[in-house]
Amino acid sequence: MLKIGDTEFTSRLFTGTGKFANDKNMLAAIGASNSELVTLAVKRLDLKTGSDNILKPLQQRRVKLLPNTAGARNVKEAIFAAHLSREMLGTNWIKLEIHPDPKYLMPDPIETLAAARILCEQGYVVLPYVHADPVLCRRLEEVGCAAVMPLGSPIGSNQGLATEPFLKIIIEQSQVPVVIDAGIGAPSQATRAMELGADAVLVNTAIASSADPVAMGRCFAQAVDTGRAAFIAGLGNVSEQANSTSPLTGFLNV
């Protein structure tokens, strides 16, 4: 069982709501993935008109909603988005995203840390999306973040765990859950993330852009379970040399 803040999760696969061809595919894929936490952009919500309103069907599935501040370029905009999400959704959970560069969408570490400190002081359950920087993740933990969400590779790139050496350090050092977010493009990559000891992964593009999002959601659910089970079982040591599994010459002495 995974616990973040005051909430426990059975599934360690978190999903997103963007890039799906339609809401029907999105809801079906989320259901197939068994995900219990779904992130959605605050900028997408419009409770006054009901336009593009995906809240009701998501709430009917009883998944935990994690609003994110995607689109925020600085501390001020991120805090405004967090306040708006609390007013609209009645939740103090927030996925903190600040990326001023629209081309590469790299998270701004300085603005993210500053915003995280303020939001934690205001009583939010903060899950910051950051580069795979062990020092930054430690600082975010120190200011009160409930989890850290280091990237595997750029958002939506499907490049996998390009930052694996740094993810290993973060997982080793962290005293809060580590959720690997961004860049996971295949179920095998999600398995690898869990084998490293990550507490969960967040996957959106790889599922949403699949030819069959429902089947892909199911594949990711199985992949995450497999990776977690392998981590618990304990992977064998990696060696630079060969190690025989049976005697090579014993029969020659008979």
Curated annotation (Swiss-Prot):
Its EC number is 2.8.1.10. It comes from the Bacteria. Keywords: Cytoplasm, Schiff base, Thiamine biosynthesis, Transferase. One of its GO terms (biological process) is thiamine diphosphate biosynthetic process. 1-deoxy-D-xylulose 5-phosphate binds at G156, A182, G183, N204, T205. SUPFAM superfamilies: ThiG-like. GO terms for molecular function: thiazole synthase activity. It catalyses: [ThiS sulfur-carrier protein]-C-terminal-Gly-aminoethanethioate + 2-iminoacetate + 1-deoxy-D-xylulose 5-phosphate = [ThiS sulfur-carrier protein]-C-terminal Gly-Gly + 2-[(2R,5Z)-2-carboxy-4-methylthiazol-5(2H)-ylidene]ethyl phosphate + 2 H2O + H(+). It is found in: Cytoplasm. Its main location: cytoplasm. Coiled coil: none annotated. GO terms for cellular component: cytoplasm. It is an enzyme of class 2 (transferase). Belongs to the ThiG family. Catalyzes the rearrangement of 1-deoxy-D-xylulose 5-phosphate (DXP) to produce the thiazole phosphate moiety of thiamine. Sulfur is provided by the thiocarboxylate moiety of the carrier protein ThiS. In vitro, sulfur can be provided by H(2)S. This is Thiazole synthase. It comes from Shewanella piezotolerans (strain WP3 / JCM 13877).
